[in-house]
């Protein structure tokens, strides 16, 4: 589907409504700086608070702006298999290139339940499906063995966004899934684990940081893929303060504050999320200046 950097793009709001004008500027910023994919309406896109009509407007506008230049992947996960399928079919109808399907949260399915969830959806769509494993938010962890079973059996499940920060799991996730199917892709779901996942044989990152620093995140991956390990490590180390600052409060609170400081969007979120504290805004201002982004 893509190799490198997929930006998990924010959803801008203004006076409580979608701000498509600011959104277009942000999408073009991503395209101009060489990102390899856009992930719309994921965690960073505040998908739980975007209604069905807004989803359609946002996905349609994204596809218009991108115009086939890079893949557009739409977040479509819920904790109901049938509701998830409905969102998948909406994305399919609109012309998305793929869907990001988070593991069902709160109801805590077993590993067999996880497998059956993805099997059910994969049998009912032709879209490429990306499994999203983020145990810190969902309360359930996709084991590497389960992911390998999915990779072996479900051919339109194209890869996994691995947001378990455990280095051992990352290594086993890449190893076992690629043994099961050589073209199965593994992307980091944590910006600060991107370099380590690449070293383990992974394929890139679905990134929050690239909202504000797309050029630098693209460089981190591109240098690694070109065999320039030291340069990739250097970029990773330079980005560490920004990676840390963008997660001092719950994502996407800090990244929206950062994009506001950069002049891209209003610093507006939907409840239950609230804007960043003054302390966080000041931290972000300093880190952005030190990173040459302000």
From Swiss-Prot:
GO biological process: diaminopimelate biosynthetic process; lysine biosynthetic process via diaminopimelate
Xref: CDD domains: DHDPS
Binding site for pyruvate: 44, 206
A GO molecular-function descriptor: 4-hydroxy-tetrahydrodipicolinate synthase activity
Chain positions of site Part of a proton relay during catalysis: 43, 106
Coiled-coil regions listed: none
Protein name: 4-hydroxy-tetrahydrodipicolinate synthase
């Amino acid at each position: 589907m893509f190799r490198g950097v997929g930006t998990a793009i924010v959803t801008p709001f203004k006076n409580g409504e979608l701000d498509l004008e600011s959104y277009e500027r942000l999408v073009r910023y991503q395209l101009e700086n060489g990102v390899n994919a856009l992930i719309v309406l994921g965690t960073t896109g505040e998908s739980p608070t975007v209604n069905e009509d807004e989803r359609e407007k946002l996905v349609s506008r994204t596809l218009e702006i991108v115009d086939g230049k890079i893949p557009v992947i739409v977040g479509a996960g819920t904790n109901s298999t049938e509701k998830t399928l409905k969102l998948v079919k909406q994305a399919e109808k609109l012309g998305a290139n793929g869907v990001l399907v988070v593991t069902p949260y709160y109801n805590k399915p077993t590993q067999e339940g996880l497998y059956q969830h993805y099997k059910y959806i994969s049998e009912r769509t032709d879209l490429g499906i990306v499994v999203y494993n983020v145990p810190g938010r969902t309360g359930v962890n996709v084991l590497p063995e389960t992911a390998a079973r999915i990779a072996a059996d479900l051919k339109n499940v194209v890869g996994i966004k691995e947001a378990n920060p455990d280095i051992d799991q990352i290594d086993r996730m890449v190893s076992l899934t690629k043994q099961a199917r050589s073209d199965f892709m593994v992307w980091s779901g944590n910006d600060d684990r991107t370099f380590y996942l690449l070293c383990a044989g992974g394929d890139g990152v679905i990134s929050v940081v690239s909202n504000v620093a797309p050029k630098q995140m693209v460089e981190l991956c591109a240098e690694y893929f070109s065999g320039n390990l030291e340069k990739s490590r250097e970029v990773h180390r330079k980005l560490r303060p920004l990676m840390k600052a963008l997660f001092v409060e719950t994502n996407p609170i800090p990244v929206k504050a950062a994009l506001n400081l950069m002049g891209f969007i209003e610093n507006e979120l939907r409840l239950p999320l609230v804007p960043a504290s003054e302390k966080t805004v000041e931290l972000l201002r300093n880190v952005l200046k030190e990173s040459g982004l302000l």
